[in-house]
Amino acid sequence: MSASSLLEQRPKGQGNKVQNGSVHQKDGLNDDDFEPYLSPQARPNNAYTAMSDSYLPSYYSPSIGFSYSLGEAAWSTGGDTAMPYLTSYGQLSNGEPHFLPDAMFGQPGALGSTPFLGQHGFNFFPSGIDFSAWGNNSSQGQSTQSSGYSSNYAYAPSSLGGAMIDGQSAFASETLNKAPGMNTIDQGMAALKLGSTEVASNVPKVVGSAVGSGSITSNIVASNSLPPATIAPPKPASWADIASKPAKQQPKLKTKNGIAGSSLPPPPIKHNMDIGTWDNKGPVAKAPSQALVQNIGQQPTQGSPQPVGQQANNSPPVAQASVGQQTQPLPPPPPQPAQLSVQQQAAQPTRWVAPRNRGSGFGHNGVDGNGVGQTQAGSGSTPSEPHPVLEKLRSINNYNPKDFDWNLKHGRVFIIKSYSEDDIHRSIKYNIWCSTEHGNKRLDAAYRSMNGKGPVYLLFSVNGSGHFCGVAEMKSAVDYNTCAGVWSQDKWKGRFDVRWIFVKDVPNSQLRHIRLENNENKPVTNSRDTQEVPLEKAKQVLKIIASYKHTTSIFDDFSHYEKRQEEEESVKKERQGRGK
C-alpha cells in the first residue's frame, strides 16, 4: 500500500472512532450537557483572571472596605505628576484611612464587567478607556490644569466614609475638605517670590489650598460655598521701586578717642620691624610741621608725638602716627593744604629710615663738630648723654678728619652693603667686619694684591637706608677660620680688621650722579655688595663724603644699638642654657 493511500484513509479512520453510540452525536445528547465543558473556551490561554473582570472575594480582603467613590491618579512620574502612595491589599479594611489612589479601582464598567457585589470594577487606567498612557490625564467633564499641583493627588477619606477628594475640588458641595498640609510645597514656593510676605498675608488660610498659585487661588475664589473674599492684589515690587528707596543710614564708627568721623581717610598701614634690618622698607611718616601741629592742636584730642629718645629705650622704634589718623567732630571741615601734603608724604612708599631720622625730616638734627648728633626730644632740645663706649671710641679714633687725603694715587675702593645698622654699630665698636663667602674672597684678594702699596677703602651703606653711613679702611687679610660671634646673624664666617675713618650719613642724592662703567653704567648708589669702584670714580665719591657737612650719623643711635646688643646676648645665653 502506498503512502498516498495511507494519508487518504487516515482521516476517515479517525473520524469513525465512535464506539457504543450513534454516528450523529446529537441524536442521543442534549445541548446543556456540554455547557460546562464549553465555557472555558471563552478564555483560551489565560492562566490568570483578566484585569477587567471582577475579583474573587476569597482572594482579596472583604468587599466592605471599598465603599468609597474613588477618583483618579496617575501611575507614572512623567511630566509634573507625583507618584501616589500605594498600600498593599492585605492592609485594606473598613473605616481605616488609606492613601490608595483612585486609579486602582475606577468607575464601574470602565474596561470590565459589572462590579462584583456592588463594588467597583478592577481598572488600572484612570478616566476610562480614553486615558493617554504616561501623559497628563484629564477626566471626562474636567478641565485640564497646567499646574503641577492639581488633581494628581488622592487624599485620605475620613473614618466615617465618603468619597475621596481630588486635589482639584474646592468647597463646592463636599462635606470633607482636602487633606491637611496639602499645599506646603506651594506655600514654600510662594515664599521665594519677591514680596511673598504680602501674598501670604492677603490670601486666606484655607486647609488644602495653595498660596501663590494662580490657578488654585482662582478656584478657591470662584467656589460656590465660600463667600467671595476681597483679596488685595500683591503690591508690585520692581527693581525701580527698590532703587528709589533711600539707603539706610549706616551707624558712624567711632575711633579710639571716641569721636565719630574723620576729616581724612586713614593712611596706609605701616609695619615697622626691628631697627636697622636691611629689608625693612616700610613707609615712615615724617613729623608734621609746627604750624600744622598748632592747627591740629585745636582738636579735642590729639596724640602727642613720642620723643625719639624714648623710642630708643626698650622696644624697636615705631613711626609716629600720621596726621591722617587724627579725628575731628562732625561736620568735618575741609582738609587744609598742609594736611594734604603731609598725608601724601605719608602715603608714598619711602626707604628705610634710621631711628635718628624717624622723629623729623632727614638732615634736621643738630650735630656737633665731632659728628656726635643731638636728638630732638619732645621734652626739650637738650642733647642726650653720650654712651661711655662711644666716648671711649671717640677718644681713641679721630672720626671724620678734616685733613683726609681723598686724592689717591694707588688704592682700591669697594662698596659694602650691610643688612642692618646693628652690624655697622658692632663693626665700629670692635673694628672688625665680615662679608659673604664670595665677598670675603674678593676683599682678601684685593688686600693681598695691594701688599701695602695703597689702602683698600670700604664704602658702607645699609640696604634700603638711602644713604652711605661711613668709610672704613681694611687693615688685615681675611681670617676664614674665625667667627666673630657678635653679628645680628650667626651665618657669617671669617673676619678681618678695619679702621673707621668717616661716620656720617651722606644721602644718595649727593652721589647718584656718579656712574660706574664696570657696573652697566649704573649709579654708584645702585651697587651690590663688594662692588669695586674704579679709582677715578672712587676719588669723586671720597671727596664728596669727606666734604659733606652731615647732620646725622649712627652715633645718634649708639645707645639704642648698645641696648639691642645686650638684649640679643641675653637671649643667646638663655638658648644656650636650654640646650644644655
Swiss-Prot record:
This is YTH domain-containing family protein 2. The gene is YTHDF2. Residues 386-580 are annotated as: Interaction with m6A-containing mRNAs. Residues 2-385 are annotated as: Localization to mRNA processing bodies (P-bodies). The disordered regions have the ability to interact with each other and to 'phase separate' into liquid droplets within the cytosol following binding to mRNAs containing multiple m6A-modified residues. This leads to the partition of m6A-containing mRNAs into membraneless compartments, where mRNAs may be stored, degraded or used to transport mRNAs to dendritic arbors in neurons. Residues 1-45, 247-388 are annotated as: Disordered. Residues 338-350 have a biased composition (Low complexity). Residues 291-317, 373-384 have a biased composition (Polar residues).
